[in-house]
């Protein structure tokens, strides 16, 4: 059980510097299972909006997709962390992400006084995509209706932000032929963040950040310059499922995002507390941000 935290008192002086800026937040499916953390997250977003910070949310939903596939008698299969998505699976993916999670989350925001609009990437061609393949040596693996983002309708998002809305986006993409694709939420959030030249991309995870040694809580790396990402991967400091996550964060910075922060979404009021205290792992071009150890 993660220790719950109270929001830091009077954070206004630190957060007002971001007024008028845009934060893109990736809200993971594994975090949604923590009801108290979800409630605190919604309140944090409400507070940031009151300060004039533009918020865009891209949500996942992997655990819920797996649950509905199991209920439908369909086995969940993955290749390099990507869900194999055939015609039956993509129907369930759309149902869960666009019809269930997206609408529930946007409804919760509106109930709590946040003007939010739930969207799928197919709405107004918000997320355009093309079919993604996995390559292993000389082998090309077809994983079905899994897509990679090619274009984001950033003007549409900006208009929503100007209208005071919080776009809540399900990572479903489409192409000009009418195909619909399942897109990794980390990659969708990174692409959207770059398209908006966002001040921050915040990735909510189920760990405190990137560790030198996953078994040592004190070994968290508080800041990574993107020029060091490949070194950390080569040395297997960054490994497993954290590799694509950090790579897409680095790509976001290379394409316009100011910095990326990976924080533990299980902590109560993580969005406020961790931004203020530079907790988690910050990925950026520079090495000038003073980071504190998580407490």
Swiss-Prot record:
Keywords: Amino-acid biosynthesis, Arginine biosynthesis, ATP-binding, Cytoplasm, Kinase, Nucleotide-binding, Transferase. Its main location: cytoplasm. Gene3D superfamilies: Acetylglutamate kinase-like. It is an enzyme of class 2 (transferase). SUPFAM superfamilies: Carbamate kinase-like. Substrate binds at residues 61-62, 83, 182. GO terms for biological process: arginine biosynthetic process via ornithine; L-arginine biosynthetic process. It catalyses: N-acetyl-L-glutamate + ATP = N-acetyl-L-glutamyl 5-phosphate + ADP. It comes from the Bacteria. GO terms for molecular function: acetylglutamate kinase activity; ATP binding. It is found in: Cytoplasm. CDD domains: AAK_NAGK-C. Its EC number is 2.7.2.8. Pathway: Amino-acid biosynthesis; L-arginine biosynthesis; N(2)-acetyl-L-ornithine from L-glutamate: step 2/4. The record marks 26, 245 as: Transition state stabilizer. One of its GO terms (cellular component) is cytoplasm. It holds the Pfam family AA_kinase. Belongs to the acetylglutamate kinase family. ArgB subfamily. PANTHER family: N-ACETYLGLUTAMATE SYNTHASE, N-ACETYLGLUTAMATE SYNTHASE, MITOCHONDRIAL. Catalyzes the ATP-dependent phosphorylation of N-acetyl-L-glutamate. This is Acetylglutamate kinase. It comes from Clostridium acetobutylicum (strain ATCC 824 / DSM 792 / JCM 1419 / IAM 19013 / LMG 5710 / NBRC 13948 / NRRL B-527 / VKM B-1787 / 2291 / W).
């Amino acid at each position: 059980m993660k220790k719950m935290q109270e929001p830091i008192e009077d954070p206004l002086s630190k957060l007002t510097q971001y007024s008028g800026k845009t934060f893109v937040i990736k809200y993971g499916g594994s975090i949604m299972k923590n009801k108290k953390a979800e409630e605190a997250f919604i309140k944090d977003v409400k507070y940031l909006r009151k300060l004039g910070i533009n918020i865009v949310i891209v949500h996942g939903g992997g655990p819920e997709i797996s649950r509905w596939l199991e209920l439908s008698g369909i086995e969940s299969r993955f290749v390099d962390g990507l869900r194999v998505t055939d015609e039956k699976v993509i129907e369930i993916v759309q149902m869960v992400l666009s019809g269930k999670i997206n609408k529930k989350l946007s409804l919760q925001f509106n109930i709590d006084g946040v003007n939010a609009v739930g969207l799928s990437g197919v709405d107004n061609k918000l997320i355009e995509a093309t079919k993604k393949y996995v390559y292993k040596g000389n082998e090309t693996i077809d994983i079905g209706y899994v897509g990679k983002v090619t274009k984001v309708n950033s003007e549409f998002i900006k208009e929503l932000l100007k209208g005071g809305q919080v776009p809540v986006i399900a990572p479903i993409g489409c192409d000009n032929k009418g195909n619909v694709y399942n897109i990794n939420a980390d990659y969708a959030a990174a692409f959207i963040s770059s398209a908006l030249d966002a001040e921050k991309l915040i990735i909510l995870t189920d760990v405190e950040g990137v560790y030198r040694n996953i078994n040592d809580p004190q070994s968290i790396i508080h800041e990574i310059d993107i020029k060091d990402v490949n070194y950390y991967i080569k040395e297997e400091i960054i490994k497993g499922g954290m590799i694509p996550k950090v790579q897409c964060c680095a790509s976001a910075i290379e394409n316009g995002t100011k910095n990326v922060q990976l924080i533990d979404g299980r902590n109560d009021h993580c969005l406020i507390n961790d931004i203020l205290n530079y907790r988690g792992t910050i990925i950026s071009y520079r090495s000038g941000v003073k980071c504190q150890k998580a407490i």
